[in-house]
A protein has these predicted regions:
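Short acidic, Pro/Gly- and aromatic-enriched capping/linker segments at domain boundaries
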Residues: 19-32
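Active-site mouth of glycoside hydrolases
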Residues: 29-30, 36-168
Length: 168
């Protein structure tokens, strides 16, 4: 009987810890849309960049957005320690910087590199959502960039069903 009780406690403890991470999603309401994180309304009070996490926390901020994934693990870990969430940016190649969206190998390579990143960070407790790109439409002519963005978003959703995706 004690063994059953012990096993039940282990089972329910692991079940409860799995339920804590309910993910982040958007719901439509009568007045618009709301961001829900781990089952509760979440209002972003954030900043771009990660250099001033302590100051952001001190003034009541709760979220940051990055432009890319350089130092992503450290940023996510540091943010988590402070109770700050991260909208993790995925820097998409820019035509104005020489990225060629007619080059299928380059586009596929970009997608594959993002796959590794999604798998690495999708379960990090500080992750709020993904931000695909940053001003890719500034001075561009090749509309295939949007096909790539759509493919990236579909790939993310196939791997990570717990976090929304936005483009910037």
């Amino acid at each position: 009987c004690i063994q059953i009780l012990f096993l039940s406690l282990i089972y329910f403890q692991s079940f409860a810890s799995n339920e804590l991470d309910l993910g982040t999603y958007i719901v439509k309401t009568n007045t618009g849309y709301e961001l829900i994180r781990n089952g509760e309304n979440y209002f972003v009070k954030g900043a771009g960049g990660y250099q001033y996490l302590n100051q952001l926390k001190d003034i009541g901020g709760n979220s940051i957005r990055t432009w890319g994934v350089d130092n992503a693990k450290q940023i996510l870990d540091d943010a988590h320690k402070l109770g700050i969430t991260v909208c993790l940016g995925l820097w998409v190649g820019h035509e104005r910087h020489g990225f060629n969206y007619d080059d299928e190998y380059a586009v596929e390579g970009q997608l594959e590199s993002f796959k590794k990143i999604i798998n690495e960070f999708k379960d990090h407790p500080a992750l709020l959502m993904w931000a695909v790109g940053n001003e890719m439409d500034l001075f561009y002519k090749n509309f295939k960039v949007w096909n790539a963005v759509e493919d990236i978003a579909a790939m993310i959703k196939s791997i990570d069903k717990k976090h929304p995706i936005m483009t910037v």
